[in-house]
Amino acid sequence: MKKKYRIAVLPGDGIGPEVMREAYKILNILKNHFSLPLETREFNIGGSAIDQEGTALPKKTLLGCENSDAILFGSVGGKKWDDLPINQRPERASLLPLRKHFNLFANLRPAKLYSELKYLSPLRSDIIKNGFDILCIRELTGGLYFGKPTGRLKKNNIEYAFDTEIYYNYEITRIAHLAFQLAQTRNFKICSIDKSNVLNSSVLWREIVKKVSKNYPDVHLSHLYIDNATMQIIKDPNQFDILLCSNLFGDIISDECAIITGSIGMLPSASLNEKKFGLYEPAGGSAPDIEGKNIANPIAQILSVSMLVRYGMNLKTIADKIDQSVISVLKKGYRTADISNNNNYLKTNEMGDVIANTLISGE
């Protein structure tokens, strides 16, 4: 590892700064207890940047990210900025440009049901008795969300709108290679999601995924149509390990997997480019309704640090220690408000302290 691993920290809006404070506790332990050569610099982003600097993504922030090895992101947005033109709102004017600027083509969304939190899942107990640990891998820069032409027109008093799904072979190839490489670090199993019985883009998707799979004979590949996949996830989520999806289908599937865990406050995510530069963030939003109340769940932000260590720094053992600290805390009965089934729960800072102390002690 090089002398310094530089992290651009972007707390953002809503609960972002609150949960980021707890992530800092973990980062400090990684520096001081595990002797990792981390260097953090904090930058403004989102609505707070609009208020202070007139733009959601200031040049200083972008430059700071360019001079870093990874981005640790909080959350952006809130009702305060909802009246702005849509392209100037924090979500559209900060996170999306960051993804585009750094060509973050791969979105990794883990969805894990912890045995201690099964009561949170909306699924029947017999369905989730064995739990599940799914990694959704979503292609993030191609497909329907970016295809041209797109528009809304009116002709002869008839209004219509259109979008275009376009996938280039190299876009599918690179996301498939990443999925197979990650499968080799997990359970050697991938299910690719498409709609190749209807869509030409999905026909190409399936053909290329099959072709790439020949380079990974130790990984079992299966395919499902998107409509069947959404049903199978509800019927038996434990049958899946890695789900490989296009942009649109991954958007749908990853949210479905998230909701059946019972709390999005537990779920981190990573967006990577071909050089493994990544943006790491909680899967949830800025939650302005609980901002400043010190009740937000910091676990997703802490696990985002774990993903940064795992995928950005390639330090699996230390990432596992962070993950295990979270599991240990849950086993001991510690809860935040969103995952508690009673009124006895920890505040945001208290949960951060418990996880940090557990990481140091290893208990």
UniProtKB/Swiss-Prot annotation:
Mg(2+) binds at D227, D251, D255. NAD(+) binds at residues 78-91, 285-297. The keyword Transit peptide does not apply. Its cofactor is Mg(2+); Mn(2+). It is found in: Cytoplasm. Substrate binds at R99, R109, R138, D227. Transmembrane segments: none annotated. Its main location: cytoplasm. One of its GO terms (molecular function) is 3-isopropylmalate dehydrogenase activity. The keyword Transmembrane does not apply. It catalyses: (2R,3S)-3-isopropylmalate + NAD(+) = 4-methyl-2-oxopentanoate + CO2 + NADH. Its EC number is 1.1.1.85. It comes from the Bacteria. Keywords: Amino-acid biosynthesis, Branched-chain amino acid biosynthesis, Cytoplasm, Leucine biosynthesis, Magnesium, Manganese, Metal-binding, NAD, Oxidoreductase, Plasmid. Binds 1 Mg(2+) or Mn(2+) ion per subunit. NCBIfam families: leuB. Belongs to the isocitrate and isopropylmalate dehydrogenases family. LeuB type 1 subfamily. Catalyzes the oxidation of 3-carboxy-2-hydroxy-4-methylpentanoate (3-isopropylmalate) to 3-carboxy-4-methyl-2-oxopentanoate. The product decarboxylates to 4-methyl-2 oxopentanoate. This is 3-isopropylmalate dehydrogenase. The lineage of its organism: Bacteria, Pseudomonadati, Pseudomonadota, Gammaproteobacteria, Enterobacterales.
